[in-house]
């Protein structure tokens, strides 16, 4: 049997009209993931792919990529939702679709837009460390090298402000609509000596499994299975779980020995990051643990925060955020209301520069450092210790109002 290709999650980011859907459609088409006859005739033929599952068809704004998959020589890619989709941020943060890399799409005729900056900042905040820049719609400027270079310099300066190294990033002139430089080199850009998009995707580095970090398994569900007992189910985020080890669930505070681990209905001796498992722990009953608890080893238990300091970006809030605001924080599988205790600093979201100390309020578009207090026990970790356990989305009124990461915490015990 051929060795399975390594898997990568890929996000497409950038301003809403810059051609992300068309690019993804063309990529899937050229990579053979979609049959030609599925495409409708006419101007937006590629977008069809993206539109199939979108209720936003009427508005002419799509974005539900529905986890489309395609393969390159080296990887199997899953395209995770693009920003613009309402649950994008929540999905990325809660781990359903943490992206390993992103393609930033910027239209050459339009240049860097505010949304371009926001998405770049957000990608960095969400821990996407690898970036490819697709300078799209080159057909609209007659494949002009000078226009490409001018925009390349502008985007390079932008991504540098948030900590990407432009020298490590491929900048590719392409046309999503015409298909230039997606899977094969285009004759329209003889001046371009770099990689095609697919070559750049193949040159991404595979994400390393975080096996050396402390064990963390956020619990998704708890089942009672006849003859086995209580079986918590969850995905191993970090570390390794072995049969016979002692684990503790926090904030529940119960612990016991792991009697069995199963994945895909087969018993396994150990589980690694990315594995979705069910496991049975001696002495832990169904009513002792619940969704949102996190399993770890007894000698390095998950941290329960009495309060924590976070860096957040306010994405969409109809009013202002002040001290005392108590929305729901979605962190791994937990959902806990948390109260804003202090607004420490307001920052420029495109540069991270501090604009104001102790602001009175925050509004849409602001980035900030804040102190918050969970209204009931919550496991969260510092982003620098265990990045997978340090991100969260803030939801209120049925929408994601902000996203952020924990930069410091006061333990509850």
Swiss-Prot record:
The keyword Magnesium applies. Its EC number is 3.6.5.3. Pfam families: GTP-eEF1A_C, GTP_EFTU, GTP_EFTU_D2. It is an enzyme of class 3 (hydrolase). Residues 81-84 are annotated as: G3. GO terms for cellular component: cytoplasm. Residues 136-139 are annotated as: G4. Residues 14-21 are annotated as: G1. It catalyses: GTP + H2O = GDP + phosphate + H(+). It comes from Methanothermobacter thermautotrophicus (strain ATCC 29096 / DSM 1053 / JCM 10044 / NBRC 100330 / Delta H). CDD domains: EF1_alpha (cd01883), EF1_alpha_II (cd03693), EF1_alpha_III (cd03705). This is Elongation factor 1-alpha. Coiled coil: none annotated.
């Amino acid at each position: 049997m051929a060795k399975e290709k390594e898997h990568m999650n890929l996000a497409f980011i950038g301003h809403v009209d810059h051609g992300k859907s068309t690019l993804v459609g063309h990529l899937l088409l050229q990579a053979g993931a979609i049959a030609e006859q599925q495409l409708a005739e006419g101007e937006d033929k590629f977008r069809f792919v993206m539109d199939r599952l979108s209720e936003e068809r009427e508005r002419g704004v799509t974005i539900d990529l529905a986890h489309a998959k395609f393969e390159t020589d080296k990887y199997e890619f899953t395209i995770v939702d693009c920003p613009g989709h309402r649950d994008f941020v929540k999905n990325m943060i809660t781990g359903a679709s943490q992206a390993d890399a992103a393609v930033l799409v910027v239209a050459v005729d339009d240049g860097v837009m505010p949304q371009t900056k926001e998405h770049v900042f957000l990608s960095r905040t969400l821990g996407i460390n690898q970036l490819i820049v697709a300078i799209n719609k080159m057909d609209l400027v007659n494949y002009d090298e000078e226009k490409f270079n001018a925009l390349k310099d502008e985007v390079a300066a932008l991504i540098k402000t948030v900590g990407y190294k432009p020298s490590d990033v491929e900048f590719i002139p392409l046309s999503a609509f015409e298909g230039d430089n997606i899977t094969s080199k285009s004759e329209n850009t003889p001046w371009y000596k770099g990689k095609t998009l697919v070559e750049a995707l193949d040159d991404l580095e595979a994400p390393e499994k975080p096996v050396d970090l402390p064990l963390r398994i956020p619990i998704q569900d708890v089942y009672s299975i006849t003859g086995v007992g209580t079986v918590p189910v969850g995905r191993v985020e970090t570390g390794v779980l072995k049969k016979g080890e002692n684990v503790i669930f926090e904030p529940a505070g119960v612990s016991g020995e792991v009697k069995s681990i199963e994945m895909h209905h087969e018993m396994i001796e150990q589980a690694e990051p990315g594995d979705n498992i069910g496991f049975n722990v001696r002495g832990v009953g169904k009513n002792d643990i619940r969704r949102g608890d996190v399993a770890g080893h007894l000698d390095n238990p998950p941290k329960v925060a009495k309060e924590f300091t976070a860096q957040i970006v306010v994405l969409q809030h109809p009013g202002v955020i002040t001290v005392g605001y108590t929305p729901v924080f979605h962190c791994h599988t937990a959902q806990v209301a948390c109260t804003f205790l202090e607004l420490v600093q307001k920052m420029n979201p495109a540069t991270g520069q501090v604009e104001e100390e102790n602001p009175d309020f925050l509004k849409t578009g602001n980035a900030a450092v804040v102190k918050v207090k969970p209204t009931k026990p919550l496991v969260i970790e510092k982003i620098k210790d265990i990045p997978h356990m340090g991100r969260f989305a803030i939801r209120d009124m049925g929408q994601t109002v902000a996203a952020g990461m924990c930069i410091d915490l006061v333990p509850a015990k």
